[in-house]
A protein has these predicted regions:
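A surface/secretory-pathway sequence property marking extracellular, secreted
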Residues: 47-56, 93-132
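Short, polar/proline-rich extracytoplasmic segments that appear immediately after membrane translocation
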Residues: 2-71, 163-167, 172-181
């Protein structure tokens, strides 16, 4: 009864409900219930945790009819409810899996299927191609429920003969329950075989080792837990990767307080780091005290220079402690990139970590990577994950699934399924234009598995008509090689790109503003649909080890003969515009773009639709 044929008769499709509840204890319970017709309620209880699923009516599809979205959305749909009637929080995901078909039958290719998933008040949902079998992820506190309406139809935009083919699926719900645990308690209970808890410092309990289970995902970024403050159980984090790369300060000024770096970290503007953190007053200690004392040693510094800020950097002692139970700088904080520490070495040099993991010092005018550090409040709790890189700890209140929400409500660093082939992952940068969402490719563009190199142009000024601008606003945008037509329609027609010059040792703000006060925008601008990131912009860093990445262009000139580029080792230098570098296309998506599914992490990026 599942065959698609030319008679255009209405068919009932069999939906198999596979409900899996996975507890934090690692025990899995599974039920397989075959639903064909009628009204049934299936309820699963494990201890005090239970999900209920109500099947209100069977799913129908018009056989042989390729429906417009407007007609597909008129279908009654398949209704079900997921409810947490236990006492604890539970996260869950909804999958649309292939069900078994009979011998001799042929399964319809997913490209022919469109679907919508209405959720709660949004009973309609957004028409979406079936490109991912995970169609929803979310979480429920005790007594909460989510009500869904699933509609499926054949996609009229796809040509092909599917006569006699079969579409048969099963609805799978995976649920996970963990008792919310304070971050400090979870870490102190153990960080895996490749890490150790070190209590030799009475003021900081350090996590040491080569690769402890201390990964945390928060506000669109992957962090490592570094230490616990025994006085209040707050937890110090640092980003795993370089979020950007800027000069530390002007020549001869190595103090953290008042530096370019302090400004960048604590910038609350629309494109600032702190301004793009999720609910900082809820998650982090905004009055954290940072030891920025100058020292030539790597041992614990005196408390000579203490700075109060929401965001800081790790000092050289904290980095050194991470290597305590490792050899040859193989500690977990060595990310094989160049990055700044908080610690001045002298009045002319600041401590930084090299790509091999050794500590060195250099002029503050040089652009090294920025790895922001924050202190989580003691009340923040872990709700999911196991602390590994593939399954980082998730924080209660930051573990939502914003299906149906506007992309413009989300956070810098979150991942988006966008683009095609090997260039199909992008990240949110900011909401610089106020209504839409600025995004950039997660890595420089690739071509046949290798990074694509391109000249900047004949001079240092980016326009849609110079070499790289012509490519970005031509072949990249229109050829179909890098973007689908639906994705192109999500992009704003025009964006203003800021082209301010940032000379050696000058403030990163000059890339966008006339001066360091940020009171007036630079007059050096251009208009184009697709551009690049500028020096110091969020996500203008490196997010893999040196050797797995490549150099790439920014928009920002150094002077009349050089353009700033982000090197594979994580620092910013400059290159002649006639040289070739990688490119990370950047653009503003329209304010109407919505999230269809996904949680925004690298392994489960947001799927979006206009």
């Amino acid at each position: 009864m599942d065959k698609i044929n030319s008679q255009r008769k209405k068919l009932i499709i069999a939906i198999t409900l596979l409900i899996i509840i996975i507890l934090g204890l690692g025990i899995t319970y599974a039920w397989l219930i075959q639903i064909v017709n009628g009204e049934k309620i299936q309820s699963m209880r494990v201890g005090t945790f239970r999900f209920s699923l109500t099947e209100e009516n069977s799913l129908t599809i018009n056989s042989g009819e390729f429906l417009k979205d407007s007609d597909g959305l008129k279908q009654e749909g398949f209704k079900f409810t997921v409810q947490n009637v236990g006492k604890g929080y539970g996260s869950y995901s909804v999958y649309l899996d292939d069900d078994s078909i009979s011998s001799g039958q042929t399964r319809i290719d997913d490209k022919f299927i469109r679907y919508s998933l209405g959720i709660n008040a949004d009973t309609t949902g957004t028409p979406t191609n079936l490109t991912s079998r995970k169609i929803y992820s979310g979480g429920l506190d005790a007594s909460e429920k989510d009500t869904f309406v699933l509609r499926l139809w054949l996609n009229p935009a796809v040509n092909g003969d599917i006569g006699g083919q079969v579409f048969k699926v099963k609805l799978r719900i995976e649920a996970n329950q963990q008792i919310p645990t304070p971050v400090a308690d979870k870490l102190l209970a153990g960080v895996g075989n490749n890490g150790t808890i070190d209590t030799t410092d009475p003021e900081q309990t350090f996590i040491t080792g080569t690769d402890p289970n201390n990964y945390i995902w928060y506000s669109g970024k992957l962090w490592r837990a570094v230490s616990i403050d025994p006085s209040d159980n707050s937890v110090k984090l640092v980003t795993q990767w370089n979020i950007s790369s800027i000069p530390y300060n002007a020549d001869g000024n190595t103090a953290f307080q008042g530096s370019y770096m302090e400004q960048w970290l604590n910038d609350t503007s629309v494109d600032g780091f702190l301004g793009n953190l999720r609910e900082p007053d809820k998650f982090i200690k905004t009055d954290s005290v940072w030891n920025a004392t100058s020292t030539t040693e790597t041992t614990k510094p005196a408390k000579t220079t203490m700075v109060t800020d929401a965001v800081g950097l790790l000092n050289v002692y904290e980095y050194t402690m991470s290597n305590k139970n490792a050899i040859d700088f193989t500690g977990y904080l060595n990310n094989d990139l160049y990055w700044w520490t908080l610690t001045p070495y002298s009045t002319s040099n600041v401590r930084n970590v090299y790509d091999h993991g050794n500590v060195n010092n250099c002029s503050p005018t040089i652009s090294r990577g920025s790895r922001p550090s924050i202190n989580l409040k003691s009340a923040v709790k872990i709700i999911d994950g196991d602390g590994t890189v593939d399954n980082p700890y998730r924080l209660q209140g930051d573990n939502d699934s914003p299906t149906g929400a506007l992309l413009s409500t989300r956070y810098s660093g979150e991942y988006i399924s966008f683009g095609t082939g090997e260039n199909n992952l992008y990240r949110i940068v900011s909401h610089e234009n106020g209504t839409g969402t600025k995004i950039t490719s997660a890595i420089p563009l690739k071509e046949s598995s290798s990074y694509k190199s391109i000249k900047f142009g004949s001079n240092v000024t980016f326009t849609k008509d110079n070499t790289i601008g012509t490519f970005l606003n031509g072949d990249y945008l229109t050829s179909g090689t890098y973007l689908t037509s639906d994705q192109v329609n999500m992009i704003e027609d025009n964006t203003t790109w800021y082209l301010g010059t940032v000379g050696s040792g000058t403030n990163y703000k000059l890339a966008k503003y006339q001066d360091a006060t940020s009171s007036s925008l630079t007059t050096s601008t251009t208009t184009a649909q697709i551009g690049l990131l500028r020096l110091g912009e969020l996500m203008a860093g490196q997010f893999d080890i040196y050797g797995n990445n490549t150099d790439y262009w920014t928009l920002t000139p150094l002077d009349a003969s050089g353009v700033r580029d982000v090197r594979g080792s994580g620092h910013v230098y400059d290159s002649s515009p006639t040289n070739s570098d990688g490119s990370r296309p950047s653009m503003n998506l329209k304010s109407t773009v919505k999230i269809v599914s996904g949680t925004g992490i690298k392994s489960d990026p947001f799927v979006i639709s206009n």
